[in-house]
Amino acid sequence: VRGRCGLLPAITDFTVMVDQTSHMFITGPDVIKTVTGEDVGFEELGGARTHNTTSGVAHHMAGDEKDAIEYVKSLLSYLPSNNLSEAPAFPEEADLATTDEDRELDTLIPDSANQPYDMHTAIEHVLDDAEFLETQALFAPNIITGFGRVEGHPVGIVANQPMQFAGCLDIDASEKAARFVRTCDAFNVPVLTFVDVPGFLPGVDQEYGGIIRRGAKLIYAYAEATVPLITVITRKAFGGAYDVMGSKHLGADLNLAWPTAQVAVMGAQGAVNILHRRTIAAAEDPDATRAELMADYEDALLNPYVAAERGYVDAVIMPSDTGSTSSRGCVSSVRSGNPCLRRSTATSRCSHRPIRSPAHREVCP
């Protein structure tokens, strides 16, 4: 977007705006003032910052037109020319040896489950040359989306960000991730998901805003995707939020977990308070009893091995092995044959792959 416009950018796959130059709105400031009496300027109403941080309509805010063009060039390098073509790849020989840089991931997760860390570190260690092109970086920062390459092949990245809202999913994050997964599915780009999610963000505003309806968009996006889906659980994977983040239950092809992964309905404190409410209430020292029960719960359930035994996780790996393991899984899926028939889903209604755009259009030749 280089000037002023209205509705049409919303039906595109990606929208790039230039700060202080681009503006989008359905009704302009003059009409709004006449109808509602509100005083608002062009920049505040529909500027690049507004649509990148608040509305989520735009995917990137460029500093100038040159920056915008460079971003678009980078973006197009990950996408095919149409939804029936292969994504552009530059195959290179896999280097599966564990390096010192890979071993840095072994110390990424803090000892305290409540201490945040930057998920960008995990993402960049897995991608070729640590190159990651983020989309909608300023909108719903509690979830990360973007593109990178694994062994020269484009992949889409979806990841919870513990640095924001502890990685909780909310309305904006759910819709942001769902649209991105659908975009990857439409253009034959595999999806690599990093999970550290304690749940959906609680709150009256979230419930009134329709978190049930809008959060379900992420379920549909993953469940209907026909591209390879690879998921890595780094730490928390609790409740319904775990299910919607590319879980095995939604048909993901390869689900990996680090030893620090915690796969459960909820965290230890919440579970103990519900399951052992009467025991704690009757105890002489409720705090000590609660702490003991929490420790038992963590030892018995808050680990990836129970999930692995039940088939919810395919392998428990060291963080330093994430790059090589996900690389093998991703590339082998890409090389599996016809790019339009990578996975079989219950949504298929004919022999052709159901190709869905982010706007939920379906094209089946």
Question: Residue locations for each model-derived region?
Answer:
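Ligand-binding clefts of soluble mixed alpha/beta catalytic domains
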Residues: 1-356
